[in-house]
Design a protein with these regions (language model features):
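Conserved alpha-helical positions within TPR/SEL1-like repeat arrays
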Residues: 13-24, 47-54
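Non-heme Fe(II)/2-oxoglutarate
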Residues: 98-189
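Residue-level recognition of tetratricopeptide repeat
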Residues: 11, 45, 77-80
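Catalytic core of non-heme Fe(II) oxygenases with the double-stranded beta-helix
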Residues: 164-167, 171, 175-256
C-alpha cells in the first residue's frame, strides 16, 4: 500500500487499506493517521470514518472520539460499528449519545434451532466437511482465536452446491428475522439494506478453545451457526455458548 501511495499520493483507498493493515498490526496511532489522510482526500468516505471512530476508541482518545461520533450522528450514519461504539462509549465514559442503529440491541437477539427445521446433517455437517476438503480453502491467522483455526476469505465466494445450500437457508432465516421485527422503529430494521451479500467462514476449535469478544465491522447483521458441538457435562452446560453483550469486559466506566 505504501508503494501504491508513492505512485498515486491522492489514492484515498490506499491510505484506508494501509490503515487497516496497521490496525491488524496493533499500530493504532499510525492507523489513525492513515484514516485521516484517506478522509482528507475523500471527505465522504464513510467506511474510513467508521474505522477512524474505532481507532480513536481503542486509543482512548476521548475528545477526538466524541467529535468523530458526533460527526457521524449528525450525518445520520446508521451502521453496526457506530451503534456498537455508541453503547461502548456510554459504558466506558458515562456519556450517552443517540444510538441511530439500535437502542436496545439485546432485544434483537434471536435463537433458532435449525436442526428442527432443515436436514442439518446434509446441509451443514456434510457441507462443512466438503468445504474444508476443497483445495481452494485455506486457513488464516486469527489473533482473536485460541487453540483453533479459521478459514480465510469468504466461503460464499466459492460457488458449489454445498455453499449454495447453506446460503439458501441463511437468506431464508434472515428474511424471517426481518419480518419478525418489521414494525420496529430501530435503524437496524428501518434502514435495512435493499440488497446484501453474505460473508462467512468456518472456525474449528479444540478442547479449551476460545474466541475473544469482537464485532464484525463490515456487517449489518451477524450470526453464528454451531455445526458440531461435542456433548457437554451438565456442570459445564454453558461451555462453548455464544455470548452477546453491549461491550467488552474492559469497557468499564472511566472515573478520571
Amino acid at each position: 500500500y505504501r508503494q501504491s501511495i508513492v505512485l498515486k499520493p491522492d489514492h484515498a483507498e490506499a491510505y484506508f487499506s494501509l490503515g487497516n493493515t496497521l490496525r491488524e498490526l496493533v499500530r493504532e496511532e499510525e492507523a489513525e493517521t492513515s484514516y485521516r489522510q484517506a478522509i482528507a482526500l475523500k471527505p465522504d468516505y464513510t467506511v474510513a470514518h467508521n474505522h477512524l471512530l474505532s481507532c480513536l476508541y481503542l486509543l482512548d482518545k476521548r475528545s477526538p472520539f466524541f467529535d468523530q461520533l458526533d460527526y457521524l450522528i449528525s450525518k445520520d450514519e446508521v451502521n453496526a460499528v457506530v451503534g456498537s461504539l455508541t453503547w461502548r462509549s456510554a459504558l466506558k465514559y458515562g456519556v450517552e449519545k443517540p444510538n441511530l442503529f439500535c437502542k436496545e440491541p439485546l432485544e434483537y437477539v434471536s435463537h433458532i434451532d435449525l436442526s428442527s427445521k432443515y436436514n442439518f446433517e446434509e446441509i451443514f455437517v456434510e457441507s462443512a466437511k466438503s468445504i474444508l476438503n476443497d483445495e481452494r480453502v485455506s486457513n488464516r491467522q486469527q489473533s482473536l482465536l485460541v487453540n483453533g483455526y479459521q478459514t480465510s476469505g469468504n466461503l460464499f465466494s466459492i460457488e458449489n452446491d454445498f455453499t449454495e445450500k447453506i446460503q439458501k437457508v441463511i437468506r431464508s432465516e434472515i428474511e424471517k428475522y426481518r419480518v419478525n421485527f418489521k414494525d420496529s422503529e430501530e435503524g437496524l430494521i428501518k434502514k435495512w439494506p435493499t440488497d446484501y451479500s453474505l460473508y462467512g467462514w468456518l472456525i474449528s476449535m479444540k478442547s479449551g478453545g476460545e474466541l475473544y469478544p469482537h464485532i464484525h465491522e463490515q456487517g449489518w447483521l451477524s450470526g453464528t451457526i454451531y455445526i458440531n458441538v461435542p456433548p457437554k457435562p451438565r456442570s459445564k452446560a454453558d461451555n462453548g455458548n455464544l455470548v452477546v453483550s453491549l461491550g467488552h469486559d474492559h469497557d468499564a466506566t472511566d472515573t478520571d
